[in-house]
């Protein structure tokens, strides 16, 4: 527990030092302002264009604006910072529960490596949904660990359906997170021992994202957010992907930290 709190505090402090608002973050806030003005979830009044990739992020800011008179920039900053901080704590605590061994000191190396990267601290705020994405991943990890531990017990059903529900939210957090949510959902379906339980898994995971998808197709006339169309998200760009990898590992010599972490983990186990 202490190590989880420490990594979360360090992450929050580092993110606060580099707090800012990006241009894309201002696009989100414009959509929220149109919602508040009664124009609907659009970038320009009268034009049905879904300008934001994350559905949940814009509506969380909208909810914050309904509950507090604070500026939208302030709401977005504190939401993102809070989500990032919570994600670091939840992920570290969940992992510590997975490796509870007498005499073993838990050091959240993954979280420490992550917050040591300047881009991680930059985009902990920025007005974008990255903090929400981290929180979703962290909670998914925690629920997955709980689900594995609860299998065969009286509480197994409840943990299964909560995991399925959370996995289903992936499409609303960011469309590409459905890769992870779908994989977890597939594992849960395979693990279910009868079709009745599989039906309940579908009932927990599918209705909310399906309802929004129907709204999206009817209101915007698209299967995906407009950002996916504008950026040709259906294309494969392996060269650009490799450029991202080298740009991440090269400037920060990240491979050294990961190698040391792997060696330390191997020695500890």
What are these regions (language model features)?
Residues 1-269:
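Membrane-proximal envelope and lipid/glycan-remodeling enzymes
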């Amino acid at each position: 527990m202490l190590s989880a709190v420490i990594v979360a505090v360090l992450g929050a402090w580092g993110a606060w030092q580099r707090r800012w608002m990006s241009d894309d973050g201002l696009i989100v806030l414009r959509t929220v302002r149109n919602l508040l003005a009664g124009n609907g979830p659009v970038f320009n009044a009268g034009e049905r264009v879904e300008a934001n990739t994350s559905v949940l992020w814009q509506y969380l800011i909208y909810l914050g604006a309904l509950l507090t008179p604070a500026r939208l920039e302030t709401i977005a900053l504190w939401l993102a910072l809070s989500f990032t901080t919570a994600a670091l704590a939840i992920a570290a605590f969940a992992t510590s529960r997975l490796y509870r061994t007498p005499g073993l000191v838990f050091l959240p190396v993954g979280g420490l490596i992550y917050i040591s990267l300047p881009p991680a601290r930059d985009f902990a705020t920025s007005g974008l949904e990255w903090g929400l994405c981290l929180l979703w991943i962290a909670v998914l990890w925690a629920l997955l660990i709980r689900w594995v531990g609860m299998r065969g017990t009286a509480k197994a059903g409840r943990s299964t359906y909560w995991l399925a529900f959370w996995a289903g939210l992936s499409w609303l957090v960011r469309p590409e997170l459905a890769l992870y949510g779908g994989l977890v959902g597939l594992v849960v379906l395979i693990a279910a021992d009868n079709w009745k339980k599989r039906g309940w898994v579908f009932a927990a995971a599918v209705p909310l994202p399906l309802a929004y998808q129907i709204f999206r197709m009817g209101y915007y006339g698209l299967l995906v957010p407009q950002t996916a169309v504008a950026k040709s998200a259906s294309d494969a760009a392996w060269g650009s992907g490799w450029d991202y990898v080298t740009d991440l590992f090269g400037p920060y010599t990240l491979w050294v930290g990961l190698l040391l972490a792997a060696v330390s983990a191997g020695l500890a186990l």
